[in-house]
Amino acid sequence: MRGAEVTDMRPSRGPFTGLLKKILFRQSIKHPRLQPLWGRLHTLSVYGMNYGGGGLIGTSGEAWALVNVVRRVCGNVAAPVVFDVGANVGDYSLLVRRHLPLATVYAFEPARSVYAELAKRVSAGGGRGGPFNLGFSDSQKTVDLYSYTVGGQEVSLISSIDLRLPTQAVEVKTRASERVRVETIDRFCEAEGVARIDFLKLDVEGHELSVLRGARRMLDEGRVSVLQFEFGPANIYSRTYFYDFWSLLAGGYDIFRIIPDGVVPIPFYGEHLEVFLTTNYLAVGKRTP
């Protein structure tokens, strides 16, 4: 990726690094009385790295990434094809149309009540794209889609995710499920004649990995230029890890963590990346100019 503002995550080299390592490996620094300090610094560091800051389009860095990375990658494409998977009521789809006015936007939302609002706001353009009352997974099937209220916000989850949130910070009210049809991205693209996805955006509450597995052919053939996925608390309940995304994508994509005014490259995998706080990631195809 050229020209985007990035921060290198590789450790710096020099005398300060050696001194820091000597200090950190001293047993005295692990003294019980220092633990509250380290806890506060850890919380501050996590916040400063934008972990947990991925919930709102305007402040998460998603808008920045769309304008400064996705638009640049799609700059040589006359009519970019964008998939907004988990479109909800269409806020992100409308943002895409504002910054990529020539894009063909496919907006997918499986929940019928939410889709009704999406359809009012996002219409088809030029006979292609538009809203679809459809979800995606790793196979074609019919599943239960649950709706629940967390802090007043409606969220939908595939039935494989455990809704018993282990937190007392918010009240969780589970509502009746509905049966919905899910498809694979590979099958949908074949049926609809979609040869390439220039930007694939995923926000499906912990089901992102299954959606990507259903797009394996498109990914392996390099027919998805850029993709964005969310990783956070829902992945605890779907039992998926950042390593799963890394294993699936790292061979063909450079992966970045999105921050409010930039993206941070992730050049290698480490256990420290398993942070289950709502965060958005960008994957840019290595074959993408």
Give the predicted meaning of each segment.
Residues R2-P289:
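Phosphate/nucleotide-binding beta-alpha loop and adjacent structural elements of enzyme active sites
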